[in-house]
Regions:
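Conserved SAM-binding motif I beta-strand of class I
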Residues: 1-4
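S-adenosyl-L-methionine
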Residues: 8-51
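Flexible loop/turn segments at secondary-structure boundaries
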Residues: 9-10, 36-37, 58-60, 96-99, ...
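Short, contiguous acidic/charged loop-to-helix segments that flank catalytic cores in large enzymes
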Residues: 20, 61-69, 93-98
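Helix-to-beta-strand junctions that scaffold the AdoMet/dcAdoMet cofactor pocket
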Residues: 22, 82-84
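A structural alpha-helix within SAM-dependent methyltransferase catalytic domains
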Residues: 41, 72-79, 107
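C-terminal catalytic and target-recognition region of SAM-dependent MTase-like enzymes
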Residues: 46, 73, 87-149
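Mobile active-site "lid"/loop adjacent to the S-adenosyl-L-methionine
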Residues: 47-77
Length: 149
């Protein structure tokens, strides 16, 4: 199940599923992921893998706390849906949340969700998105896979 708040993004996902011949096993909905994840938690749903790719949540330092709250909340909700021993795949695409802070946010979410986590892999962007050390906003992608107990 793929969720996105953007109808255009969902339409593109549907078209890609059709192009790849997987439209019978891939389903997409226009929805607010925060609301859906919360509802699924209330329903007691659990999954082997939950993948989160939220928006940046902030584009300025003035609203960095909003981003921290957003990342923590969506990851907390995602962790609650992961079966014991399953995996949470998550990411962040803002340079204002550096890799160290992103990992701290994930740790805070795990604590609040009362789940133990084991890092499987943590990466930043690939070579086609170069990090230019003298330009602060070029290191922005973070990708994490954790096993959730």
């Amino acid at each position: 199940m793929g969720l996105d708040i953007s109808a255009n993004a969902v339409q593109q996902a549907i078209q890609n599923a059709e192009l790849n011949g997987v439209q019978n096993i891939c389903h997409f909905e226009v929805a607010n992921a925060f609301d859906v994840l919360k509802q699924w938690g209330k329903e007691g749903r659990h999954y082997d893998v939950v993948m989160l790719d939220p928006p940046a949540f902030t584009k300025s330092r003035e609203t960095i706390q909003k981003a921290i709250t957003g990342y923590k909340e969506i990851n907390l909700r995602g962790m609650k849906l992961v079966k014991q021993g399953g995996f949470l795949v998550t990411s962040s695409c803002t340079n204002l949340v550096n890799p160290e802070l992103f990992l701290q946010i994930i740790d805070m979410a795990a604590k609040d969700a009362r789940r133990k986590i084991r890092q499987v892999i943590f990466q930043t962007q690939s070579a086609d998105h170069p990090v230019i050390r003298s330009i602060e906003n070029t290191q922005y992608l973070k990708f994490l896979i954790i096993q959730v107990q």
